[in-house]
A protein has these predicted regions:
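Short acidic-hydrophobic surface loop/beta-edge motif
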Residues: 6, 18, 107-114
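Active-site HxH/HxHxD metal-binding segment of metal-dependent hydrolases
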Residues: 27, 32-109
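Conserved phosphate-coordination/catalytic loops
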Residues: 22-26, 50, 160-163
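A structural micro-motif
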Residues: 1, 38, 63-66, 115-117, ...
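Metallo-beta-lactamase
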Residues: 116-187
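Residue-level marker for buried hydrophobic side chains located in beta-strands
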Residues: 21-23, 44, 68, 139-140, ...
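Short Gly/Pro-enriched turn/cap motifs at secondary-structure boundaries
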Residues: 6-7, 100-102, 120-123
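Conserved beta-strand hairpin/beta-sheet module of binuclear metal-dependent hydrolase folds
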Residues: 1-36, 131-145
């Protein structure tokens, strides 16, 4: 599984592309360019904060059959610019309305188009956070960023849960020898 990291401009968030899937959805033009005419099957969302979702509507306009995989709380946050914090940067304000695309995932193992996906609920940075284990990779969003401290000052943050889940993800990654793909990139 080859993974391409798309470095988004907004808050240096990261979007990952592999085998017709995305993890998070930032700069739509960069994403569409990286797909280079290939099919987009689905988008896994780690949480609903603006810097991880702001390209969603434009990408789904280009790929209307792609599914959006997320937690129930992320789904609720996609529809509310206060919950997804997009009201903070008005030019990226976002309220999602395309519910036919959304597949709510609970913690556990799922088979999606023949691909095994382990979903881990990791609230803390935000109450809706999920991490995804696919093959020997773990996509941690903002729940575990090896080179940065977790930000826990949002309205739905929980500092103690954030640190607990960060330690849990670090342990899972180390014990299972998983390569970590966090929700932000560094220069």
């Amino acid at each position: 599984m080859e993974i391409t990291c798309i470095q988004n401009e907004l808050l240096q968030s990261a979007t990952y592309l592999f085998d017709g899937y995305l993890v998070d959805c930032g700069d739509s033009a960069k994403i569409i360019n990286a797909l280079d005419g290939k099919e987009l099957k689905g988008i896994f969302l780690t949480h609903c904060h603006q810097d991880h979702i702001y390209g969603l509507e434009k990408v789904l306009t280009q790929f209307p059959h792609a599914k959006v995989y997320c937690s129930q709380k992320t789904w609720e946050g996609l529809k509310d610019d206060k919950l997804n914090l997009s009201y903070i940067i008005p030019e990226h304000s976002f309220c999602f309305r395309q519910d036919k695309n959304v597949v709510v995932l609970n913690e556990g193992c799922h088979t999606i188009d023949g691909m095994e996906v382990e979903v881990i609920s990791t609230p803390g940075h935000s109450e809706d956070c999920l991490s995804f284990v696919i093959n020997d990779k773990i996509f941690t969003g903002d729940s575990y960023i090896p080179f940065a401290k977790i930000f826990t000052k949002w309205p739905t943050s929980n500092k103690s849960l954030a640190f607990e889940n960060e330690a849990r993800l670090k342990e899972i990654a180390e014990n299972r020898n998983l390569k970590v793909f966090p929700g932000h990139w560094t220069r």
